[in-house]
Every structure is written in structure tokens, then in C-alpha cells.
Amino acid sequence: MSKKSSLGRGLDALLTKKGEPVAQAGTGTQVQTLKIERIAQAAYQPRQVFEPESLAELAQSIREKGVLQPLLVRPRGDAFEIVAGERRWRASQLAGLTELPVMIRDLGDREALEIAIVENLQREDLGPLEEARAYQALLDQGLNQEGVAQAVGKGRSTVTNALRLLTLPEPVLRALDEGSISASHARAVLTQPEADRLWAFEQIRSRGLNVREAEALKRERGGRDKGQGAPIKVNPPRAYRQLELDLSRRTGTRVKITGEDKGRVELNYGSREELDRILQILGYEAEE
């Protein structure tokens, strides 16, 4: 049986292998109970970020309803290493549990890694860089990109595009990890020639560009290099956007600022009465 094809169909296919007896010699698909101190953190966990608020909510749910889905663990000396379910394990400790339901499977490193990645992908728990690093870990285990795609049930292009994120400059990776730019922004940076990627990243941050504007930076850079005139128009930087919001709140109408060093301020009104109200707010009194 191909482990990769089984994993590609999901965890259920792996955990209920056809013809496999249930729970022999303390391992298998039978749910058992282990003391929580005998359960160890995963050697490789694709998910790097566990939000404290989310863990606290899960801990409260566990206090009220218990752990509804057992952890998957594998023997490691006198302990058992988590393969799938680390978030439940962390939350159970917060909830004060002393025992946890588990399924014990004798798994090799690569198979354990594949299962951990598939579980997180099925739950949509991984950030873009966590997903890319997880694929890279499978490559490091000896799989090629096609093998990784089969193992996790994704298209090869999905795996390839995710791995490309790892080629970004370190400041971009750090910003993506911190959430200060989106994966779509990062992919827009990837469309730039390698020498221009840091420049594009700084433009996105300093000018507050949206994804569409970030994608257009390649044309802007090309136009400047070839002397083809002024750069494309983009939205005002973040400071202007904040000013738009402040003026909109003050006047009670939509305000739009275009341009940077030079430009215009537009105020919208829907009636003569609304115009009079805006003029009064601005301190202008029309002559009778």
C-alpha cells in the first residue's frame, strides 16, 4: 500500500488501513488513555504559532465537554510523542487535565511528519510560511515535489508556489511571519526580479500599497529604468488614508485625497442641505 496516496486521501485513510487488526500489543487504532506527563511535544510541528486566546477558548471547551477527539501519538522510549493533536494537548494542560485519550501508532519519522502536515492542512491551521516550511521538511526527508504533493493531497503547482515563498529576502519573510504583509503581497514581491524584491517590499510598506498596486510595481520599476515617464498612480500612503477617515468622521461625508506632494481633496454631498452642513463645519458662511 502506498503511504503517500493514503495520506493524500486524508487521515481517515491512514488510520483505518484495510485488513489491519485493531490494537495489538498496545498500539493501533483503539483509543486508550495516557497520563498527560507521558505525552511529549512533537519533534516536528508544522504549526509554529498557537494563539493564546484560541488556546484559552479550547481549554474552556475541554473543561466543559472533555477532549472529543483523541491525540495520535507514537512510542518514544518511555514516553509517547505527539504526531497529531498538539493544540489539544496544550489546551488540556491549561484545562488541568491529567489524562488524555490517544491512539498509539508505531510510525517512522517521514510518515509521522506527513500525518502532522495533513492534519494541519485539513484543519486549515497553517500560515503560508508554516505550510511552505512543512513542504520543505518533507523534501528534506527525501521526497521530490511530486511526492510531497501526493503525500498531502495537493496539486504540484500548489506545493511549488508555496515553496517559492522561502526564496524571499529575510525581511520579507519576517514581515510575512509577523502578519504585517499578506501572502498575496509576498507573492507580488516574488514577481519582481530578484534584485528588486527588497525595493518592492519597502514600497509596499512605505506607501501602504494594496495587492493590485503591489503587482503593478513591476511595470513602475520597468518604466523608470527605461525612462518611460512617471510611475503609475497608486493610492495615497497610510497617513493620507487616516486623514481621509478623520475628515470623513468630522464632516459626516465621504472624503477622498488623491496625489501626494500635489493633489486634491474631494468631499461628496447628496443634497444642498448636506452641502450647507459641511460648509458650516468648515467654518464657511454663505452670503444671504
UniProtKB/Swiss-Prot annotation:
Gene Ontology MF terms in the entry: DNA binding
Disulfide bonds: none
Family: Belongs to the ParB family.
Database matches in Gene3D superfamilies: 1.10.10.2830, 3.90.1530.30
Organism: Deinococcus radiodurans (strain ATCC 13939 / DSM 20539 / JCM 16871 / CCUG 27074 / LMG 4051 / NBRC 15346 / NCIMB 9279 / VKM B-1422 / R1)
GO biological process, one term: positive regulation of sporulation resulting in formation of a cellular spore
Protein name as annotated: Probable chromosome 1-partitioning protein ParB
Key words, A-Z: Chromosome partition, DNA-binding
